[in-house]
Amino acid sequence: LGLATLSTEEARVLAGLGNRWNGRLPNVKNLSPETAAVLAGFKGVNEVVNKVVRLELDGATLSAETVRELARFPGVLLLRGLTQAALSDDMLAALGEYNGGGLGLGGLTALSPDLAKRLATFATKFLFLDDVIELSTEAAQALAGFPGSVSLDGLTELSPELARALGDLRKRSLKGVTSLSPEAAAAVVEGFQGNDLTLNLTSLPADTAKELAKGRYNSLFLDRLTELSDEAAAALGECSLTNLWLRRLTELSPGAAKGLAGLKAAGQLGPTLRLDSLRSLSPEAAEAFAASNITYLELIGLKTLSAGTARALARSKAFSGSLPGLTTLSADAAA
């Protein structure tokens, strides 16, 4: 909505819409505590079956009194336009009481160690700090004390020191990081104690792949990779995994396929390999997969299928047999 002001009566109308309203009021300035009480606590609003699940407001113009009312909101609370200067002690105290679906502090591009330490004491279980583009090791160490999940998707670089300082990486979202040095990858592997590791890497040097292969997790999801060298594939082939997903690869050389064919199971399950976007597969690559220990192979993106590839896949116990994207099939392959 393009509203610049909001009365309590207007707030009751919006709150009464429940989840039919998206909760966005980015242009409203100086929201009063009374109006905030209506939006956040549904004061004076008739019973709504499905209440609004998110509020998005201009946080820079809010008073501490207004924030105290907003802290009662049970859904996700997103405050835009904030700066460290705008976050007074009174406002931080009020925000610290919020225990709804998740707190977003938009506009903060950096965190001082003192502010990070304060945020670590907040009651909420989810912090969205996606505008932060700079984070010192000291601030990361302070933020590591926060027991919930923290989204830091605005960070684009991750040093080994920062990876170690962030604490439990199972609870840290770093979707903006698209490359890792071998040293940073080693730190990620060291700090990640979960089952499924998702990385938004768009490039994967062989040395980095070697470090990732040392991890003790069930699944490795690298779904933004569009290219994979033979050397990096060979390194990934040293992994013991239940699942390896490379769902954006459009091409795979025979050498890379032979490297991936070395995958080993983690425990009793797998390994499974998803290559959903591959458009073609050479007979040599298909032969490598057919002879591997892979238990499930997804190739739903294949556009063409040669006779040699078809014969090799027919011998594979892993190939799912699903080829919904196939547009070209030779007579020999069909036979």
Residue ranges and their predicted role:
Residues T35, T66, M91, A139, ...:
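Conserved beta/loop motifs at nucleotide-recognition and modification sites
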Residues S330-A335:
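Short, intrinsically disordered, charge-balanced linker/junction segments flanking boundaries
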Residues L1-T8, G16-P33, G41-S63, R72-D89, ...:
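Concave beta-strand-loop units of leucine-rich repeat
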